[in-house]
Amino acid sequence: MATKHPLPGSERTVEQGSKLIGDCDPSEKIEVFVMLRRQRQAQFDALMSRIEAGDPNVEPLSRDTLAKDYGASPDDIAKVKAFAAAHGLTVVRADPAARSVLLSGTVEQFQNAFEVKLEKYQHHTAGEFRGRTGAVNVPDDLHDVVEAVLGLDNRPQARPHFRIRPPFRPARTHQASFTPLELASLYKFPDGDGGGQCVGIIELGGGYDPADLSSYFASLGVPSPTVKSVSVDQARNEPTGDPNGPDGEVTLDIEIVGAIVPGATIAVYFAPNSDAGFIDAVSRAVHDTVNKPSVISISWGGPESIWTSQSLKAFNSVLQTAAALGVTVCAASGDSGSSDGAGAGDHVDFPAASPYVLACGGTSLSASGTSITHEVVWNDGPQGGAGGGGVSGAFSLPAWQEACRLRCRKAARSRSQSAACPMSRATPRRLPATPCSSRAHKRWSAARARSRRCGPR
């Protein structure tokens, strides 16, 4: 039997607040997502450096070119298939363009294959999940081939970033809700209905009712867009019946995009809420040769600090691929303030923290006619809700934010004290995403949603 070594960055610890409740059923069937290295990595890095520097002579890659030149090599995929066969695992899907292989097998088979112990945990908010501690182990011939092994542990990785606005209180400062069309007018959204384009939306739970969507778009006087549900890793459109839960996020995402660009096709990718499911969903959208989304919207995320190094690297690599293809990825920056709900200290939200993502924050505004009269950062939510943002602890400052670094240095000198740059890769740009109305489960709601966006990079 080949000697196995820990996969760098794969170490897991016990989730804070979790309780071990026993071993996993060794006969339980699970799926595991394996991500492989990229061919011609140095050449790809050189291309990305030109893109990040804003070189006007660089054109986005086509999906065909990306797959041929920068996908996983046939030899690397063959090595993973041989490893799977040696351990009785089944190859469900091998995607050279996405550099991924999806494996299926029993808990016992995966424990033996990767030398891990899978156990059941109970968490007071996340519920029951399959977890592991320590590192994933791979043999010598896969050590430089495999970048990540995800799905052995299926703890919930993200939460939806939206909040239902509480009822109006006349004693407080005047508040008003806006329809997406009103917001588009206030922010001078460009003309056009998105015809010929596709917007991908990533969802990690819940679902939508087509009747709710039809009613909502009819109330706005706009045609209902074409909405497609795409199943990823056996997840699907499954409404929970609770508009205050993930259904509210799913419905709101579709309604905002559909109202502003009704001519665009909307592909909603439903995936399990785990690091494997999240990454695979975005990867499937990026490499979707049928729907070909040119914009991907993500309203889910979690503190950067709870991701393993391998999952951060794998996810960021997918987002980098999107940038190479000219696909704009927008993600909510969070709604739990500077802590991102992670307890003590400052934390930023991922995937908004990636340098290849357009991070979207929220504001509160007042308007008169077609003009914004007052706008401030959203910072007054119930139970401590506030817009997220900050400085990434995982990604260094990209070239296109050097101007921010200089502004911060000048500000520090003018105050004769040090100052931290308020923008990093964690918030490459903060976009307003203000209160707007939506309809879910036959009920109208006004939501403070920090992730309403659609548009070209």
Each model region followed by its residue ranges:
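Short acidic, Gly/Pro-enriched loop/turn segments at secondary-structure junctions
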Residues: 366-373
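Substrate-binding/charge-relay-adjacent region of secreted/lumenal peptidase catalytic domains
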Residues: 2-94, 102, 107-362, 386-452, ...
